From Swiss-Prot:
Transmembrane segments: none annotated. This is Ribosomal protein L11 methyltransferase. GO terms for molecular function: protein-lysine N-methyltransferase activity. It is an enzyme of class 2 (transferase). GO terms for cellular component: cytoplasm. It comes from Lachnoclostridium phytofermentans (strain ATCC 700394 / DSM 18823 / ISDg) (Clostridium phytofermentans). GO terms for biological process: methylation. It catalyses: L-lysyl-[protein] + 3 S-adenosyl-L-methionine = N(6),N(6),N(6)-trimethyl-L-lysyl-[protein] + 3 S-adenosyl-L-homocysteine + 3 H(+). It comes from the Bacteria. Belongs to the methyltransferase superfamily. PrmA family. Keywords: Cytoplasm, Methyltransferase, S-adenosyl-L-methionine, Transferase. Coiled coil: none annotated. Its main location: cytoplasm.
Length: 333
């Protein structure tokens, strides 16, 4: 099915009022495009390291929205023009130019799946999408099935590969594992498959926690969804999944377990790893490892300094493409 895309040009000053007017006309799914600089608070909510280049703010905003039924278009144009005329008494609405284009209806949530194929992380670890068949398999292969849904973590990204390889290198069988920012659960699953006795995974996104549970089930690993008010039992052979913010919530950290883990992994972003490094040691036993990844190379030194500042010993720094992973150790005391 084809949709009609309408683009309305206005000013950044008037954009909120114009959007309210469009909503009053029954228009939903509004997208605003402008060059207004991103605030520090917005940067935090975006969870990205590299910000888009917006160019100089020209005071112009474009509001995009979509129509399924073209028959509604003539009357809608009239209503929009009338609404703009009313707003002109209060604010500069700009040109009010309305342009029309056509776009195909696509399954944007699932289209990426056609590009996600089975692949090898190394000689023995194979990542396979749940919807794909594995044509070749060696007896020694450890095959992990993943459907990340909308959560991060197919295993294909350099940051995830770095974590997987470091888990394989440093984690001992029988370890207690904590995965902070678990995403799809891929690192938790691989950790358990490589011999972790117990595993706890946490993410600030409830959807990620749900995706992790589903992927644990697919890989025939026992996993339970825990409330943020629950306390971890760290039952042998079981994965416990929490949602919440361990950086800000001291009570949650206590419930997950202090001084309890041999191995902590965090494949997130540099701007989150830095404050995490101040509290992650609370989870760790003396001599435990902290593997961080998701660090863009331009921020690697900043993360390294934060980890050292919080009393860790850096064992190894590995890179892949533009990304860095840091293996750190809590001193034995």
């Amino acid at each position: 099915m084809k949709w009609k895309k309408l683009s309305l040009e206005t000013t950044t000053e008037a954009v909120d009022l114009v959007c309210d007017m469009l909503l009053s006309l029954g228009i939903e799914g509004i997208e605003v495009v402008d060059k207004v600089p991103i605030t520090e608070e917005e940067k935090k909510r975006m969870f990205i390291d590299i910000l888009p280049e917006l160019g100089e703010d020209d005071g112009i905003a474009t509001i995009n929205f979509y129509l399924e039924n073209e028959e509604d278009l003539p009357s809608l144009k009239v209503s929009i023009q009338e609404g703009l005329d009313e707003l002109r008494d209060f604010v500069e609405v700009g040109s009010g130019k309305l342009s029309l284009s056509e776009t195909e209806d696509k399954d944007w949530i699932n289209n990426w799946k056609e590009f996600f194929k089975p692949f090898r992380v190394d000689d023995t670890i194979v990542i396979k999408p749940t919807w794909e068949k594995l044509e070749e398999r060696k007896e020694t292969d450890l095959v992990i099935e993943i459907d990340p849904g909308t959560a991060f973590g197919t295993g294909a990204h350099e940051t995830t590969k770095l974590c997987i390889l470091n888990i394989k290198k440093y984690m001992q069988p029988g370890a207690t594992l904590l995965d902070v920012g678990c995403g799809s659960g891929i690192l938790t699953i691989i950790g358990r498959k490589l011999g972790a006795k117990t595993a706890v995974a946490i993410d600030i996104d409830e959807n990620a926690v749900s995706a992790s549970k589903e992927n644990c089930d697919v890989n025939q690993l026992e996993a339970v969804l825990c409330q943020s008010s629950d306390s971890s039992t760290r039952t042998e052979g079981r994965i416990e999944l929490f949602d919440g913010n361990v950086i800000e919530d001291r009570g949650l950290r206590e419930r997950i377990g202090l001084n309890s883990y041999d191995f902590v992994v965090a494949n997130i972003l540099a701007d989150i790893i830095i404050p995490l490094s101040a509290v992650v040691g609370e989870f760790m036993k003396p001599g435990a490892y902290f593997i961080s990844s998701g660090i863009i190379d331009m921020k690697a030194e900043e993360v390294k300094e934060a980890i050292l500042r919080n009393g860790f010993i850096i064992e190894e720094i590995t890179t892949m493409g533009d990304w860095t992973s840091i293996v750190a150790k809590k001193p034995n005391k």
